[in-house]
Amino acid sequence: MLLYVHIPFCESKCPYCAFGSVTGAQNLARDYFSAMINDFRAQTQNLDVLRRRISSVFFGGGTPSAIGAKFYEPLFSEISPFLARDCEITAEANPNSATLSWLKTMRNFGVNRISFGAQSFFDDKLKFLGRIHDARQIKKAVSNARAAGFSNINADLIYGTKLDTKKRLLEEVSNVRDLGVDHVSAYSLTLEKNTPFYGRQSLKKDSAVLAKFLIRELENAGFKQYEISNFGRICRHNLGYWQSKDYLALGAYAVGFRRNFRFYNAPNLERYIANPHEKKREILNSDELNLEKIFLGARSVVGIEAKILTPPQLKNARILESLGKLKFKEGRFFNENFLLADEIALFIAG
């Protein structure tokens, strides 16, 4: 089982970001964490969660480092008995707000993986993306993370912007390699609804061409691709999603999954604080669960179990195998090109 914790607080809102987040609301942090503690108690009881069964925790956002580390202590005290002894605990952080003190305190609480929202090592691109840090701060943040005791560090990159060229992307790869990070998450710029970037096609470049180039160069730099957007030392939390593991979800905007249903927390900070037990449930039937497993397996090294496929789906998978699009090994079909994951999944699903 996994645990996702959503920290919606941000210092500023990036123009491409469609995630649930708020600015200027840090004064609500104490009440928010209290609500999450109450929510966790209810979820573990209602969903029959046993102690030491949570194998991974992920603090995402928003910006977890926008909130003082002291606010996390009561929550860690609450969740600790349910964590496996080798639990992977990741916290996202921004280079400008992840101070050495914050990193040390979070490391002492048990966080053992840090994920920096670097996005780029070019200051003009960072400005274009609305980021409030610069390349120098990225390098300092990684150095501080090492000093704080972290030996598992991720850096996020965004590509497919109007400023990107193969030459510049090659330099991005050189920077993450030289920093010695363990993992890279690389995301194509998407023009999401309800964001300032929405519909502005002039902000993008051909991400398919750039994606192929970036994937090749990241792998040449030693970051092996294991999922459509992730490279390097495998993140257990990411892998857990692709394996269709159950996951609890704390915080406003967060989504959880248990057995055959998905639940949605209140999509509003104040509403969540007022009633953290407000949940919208979505029951998934066997066909929907089957489709999800096909899509998730096609997007990652997890692969697709042959035994979950219907006879027509198995026939389609064999066709793709004969065309060299899939490999079959030990009862699973493995995708040879993650960029075609959705098309492959749709073909198999029929």
Regions from the language model: what does each represent?
Residues 1-3:
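Extreme N-terminal starter segment of soluble prokaryotic enzymes
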Residues 8-21:
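Local cysteine-cluster metal-coordination motifs and their immediate loop/turn environment
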Residues 18-45, 55-308:
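C-terminal scaffold of the Radical SAM
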Residues 310-322:
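Short amphipathic alpha-helical interaction segments
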Residues 321-331:
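A short, conserved structural fragment
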Residues 332-336:
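Minor-groove-contacting beta-hairpin "wing" of winged helix-turn-helix DNA-binding domains
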Residues 337-350:
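Short, amphipathic alpha-helical interaction segments positioned at domain boundaries
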